[in-house]
Amino acid sequence: HAHEAVVAKSGAEGRKGRMATTLTLWMGVWPNFYLLQVGDSRYYLWRQGTLTQVSRDQTIAQDLVDQGVMSRTAAKRSQFANVLSSALGADEATPVVTKLQSEWNAVHLLCSDGLTKHVTDERLAERLTAMTSAKELCEQLLQDALDGGGTDNITIVVGRAVPKDGE
């Protein structure tokens, strides 16, 4: 219904072009969690000192990388790096749902491309290694993105599943 709502809102505002947006949603239902993603906002999992990008950017550049037509390095500089191949409200909206096993103390990082355009995975890992609180991590990453140019909206959400006392 989210896709239809964005399409309807775009039509109601009489826009010449269509409105579109990305979505990355994390939901925990112990002992699993679910990731729903459309677009190029990302989900990273940080556990045992390892950062893993679980989501896949739904961009034309990433499609070309997947097809072996373009390297990852070239994709970052490509004119297609920010051209979405799937988005809510666009002609094509292909949500990807991933089911993963929950793990106590793993850190979940959801972010828009406004962060990942300006902050490398290596820098994300450095910040996660030194993390003392989710709030502080978000503030540091936001500042890193702004210092790197801050050319897009920047959204950062960090969470961790922690057992109750006695579990």
Which positions does each model-derived feature cover?
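PP2C/PPM-type serine/threonine phosphatase catalytic domain
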Residues: H1-E167
